[in-house]
């Protein structure tokens, strides 16, 4: 959660004044007088702002530019230039805008284990650019919107319009999945022709699928239920990527992984949350700038987003935490009833104290959900917890109690001691094994699982003296 967001009224969109880097890593100058480049240029500041700004580290920028440069040399459109931006986000994501704007998050760089895996991601995004997928999708979206409006107007039926819109979304989803598969084909070809391991695409798709399972509160949940997703399911993409890679030779016998220079380039990379947005440490959220901290119950997962801190737990329990400026200095009981809570039960509003701070609570309900609303005043700000459980669940009060009981001010010494986590590349010494190395991991209660994940170590794998591995530490 951004400090800026809590010092003024929290909004659903985050638009800080962040300008493009004065010295970005550019493979080539963005082509002038290109309408596609103009479209990308318009969207670039918004993309950068929504992902926490640019990640500025000369060593890592040079690494990414080196990989992109090798791919550009074998591009289907050698006249196409690219601008590569590393986004300051722990999310694992990469995407492209028309005109050659490519984006990769530092979270993705932290998960990758060699240059060929990042090359697989970038070549896929370059495939979108060279195939003009962004322009094609925009045209298709405009056509589907027009078509659904025509159906609604001709038939004079809201139901018909909604049905037409739903069919349009399905057609767009299929179109997007087709684009993704086409970009995969282009990407694997570029990988092999650039001299990288062509099997890196399948390998990194495996890693991303494993990360998705790791982050899920329910690891057994079906990851393929979202049939409107713009990406085909991972199993399908992995199989197809391996099939296309075989054109270059057998797995393990072709291409360069670029592991050593890649690990050199990400050693010291910021991992997880940035200082401006606070830190997640296991079941605890801490924000030195705001001077506050709180815990979530066991088995909950915290997701620190720009606009708010979200937490999810078993049995569909969800928590949202954010803050607003205390501009009117009204009583907190009046604040709760001022209209921002839907389905509020006024009879449940009561004033309380939370670790010496003025606070108030209330209950609300809407559709299939019951809510606890807790607001706490501290230093001219109002912090807000919204806890949601399925209607009738007995977990509402225990969950809200944990949040309230643990919310407190940090001491100046506590705030000053907070440090960001980083990727640290270490060499395995004699006598060390996966368990001893995982014990050095910080910021997680699942040390062994996360160590295996970020190093792409399969079940039963071992390490040997001299191997280089990643750990997460301050």
Residue ranges and their predicted role:
Residues 413-445, 467:
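Primarily a LysM-type cell-wall glycan-binding module
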Residues 299-301, 309-310, 317, 322, ...:
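Extended non-catalytic domains of envelope/secretory-pathway proteins
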Residues 320, 337-387:
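Signature of long, low-cysteine stretches enriched in small and polar/charged residues
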Residues 446-474:
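Extracellular LysM carbohydrate-binding repeats and other cell-envelope/extracellular binding modules
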Residues 119, 302, 385-422:
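Surface-exposed amphipathic alpha-helical segments
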Residues 4-290, 294-296, 301, 306-308, ...:
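A Zn2+-metalloprotease active-site environment signal
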Residues 312-323, 424-426, 471-474:
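Short, surface-exposed polybasic-and-hydrophobic patches located at secondary-structure transitions
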């Amino acid at each position: 959660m951004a400090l800026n967001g809590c010092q003024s009224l929290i909004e659903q969109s985050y638009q800080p004044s962040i300008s493009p880097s004065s010295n970005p890593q550019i493979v080539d100058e963005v082509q002038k007088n290109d309408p596609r480049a103009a479209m990308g240029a318009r969207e670039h500041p918004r993309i950068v702002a929504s992902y926490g700004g640019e990640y500025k580290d000369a060593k890592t920028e040079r690494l990414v530019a080196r990989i992109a440069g090798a791919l550009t040399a074998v591009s289907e459109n050698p006249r196409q230039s690219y601008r590569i931006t590393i986004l300051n986000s722990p999310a694992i994501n990469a995407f492209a805008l028309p005109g050659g704007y490519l984006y990769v998050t530092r979270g993705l760089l932290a998960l990758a284990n060699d240059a060929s895996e990042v090359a697989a991601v970038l070549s896929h995004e370059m495939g979108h650019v060279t195939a003009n997928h962004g322009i094609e999708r925009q045209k298709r979206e405009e056509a589907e919107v027009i078509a659904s409006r025509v159906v609604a107007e001709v038939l004079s039926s809201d139901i018909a319009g909604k049905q037409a819109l739903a069919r349009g979304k399905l057609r767009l989803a299929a179109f997007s999945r087709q684009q993704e598969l086409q970009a995969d084909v282009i990407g694997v070809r570029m990988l092999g022709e650039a001299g990288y391991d062509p099997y890196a695409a399948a390998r990194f798709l495996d890693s991303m699928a494993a990360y998705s399972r790791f982050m899920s509160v329910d690891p057994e949940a079906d990851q393929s239920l979202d049939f409107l997703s713009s990406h085909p399911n991972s199993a399908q993409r992995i199989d197809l990527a391996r099939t296309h890679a075989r054109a270059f030779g057998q797995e393990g016998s072709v291409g360069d992984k670029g592991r050593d220079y890649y690990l050199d380039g990400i050693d010291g990379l910021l991992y997880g949350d940035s200082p401006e947005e606070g830190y997640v440490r296991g079941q605890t959220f801490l924000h030195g700038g705001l001077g506050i901290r709180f815990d979530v119950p066991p088995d909950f997962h915290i997701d620190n987003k720009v606009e708010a801190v979200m937490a999810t737990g078993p049995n569909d329990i969800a928590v949202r935490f954010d803050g607003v400026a205390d501009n009117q200095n009204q009583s907190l009981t009046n604040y709760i009833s001022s209209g921002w809570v839907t389905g509020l039960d006024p009879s449940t509003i009561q004033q309380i104290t939370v670790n010496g701070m003025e606070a108030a609570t209330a209950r609300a309900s809407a559709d299939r959900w019951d809510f606890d609303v807790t607001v706490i005043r501290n230093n001219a700000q109002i912090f807000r917890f919204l806890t949601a459980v399925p209607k009738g669940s007995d977990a509402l009060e225990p969950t809200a109690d944990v949040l309230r009981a643990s919310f407190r001010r940090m001491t100046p010494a506590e705030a000053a001691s907070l440090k960001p986590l980083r990727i640290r590349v270490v060499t395995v010494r004699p006598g060390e094994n996966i368990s001893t190395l995982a014990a050095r991991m910080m910021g997680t209660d699942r040390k062994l699982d996360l160590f295996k994940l970020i190093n792409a170590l399969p079940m039963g794998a071992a390490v040997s003296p001299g191997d280089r591995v990643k750990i997460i530490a301050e």
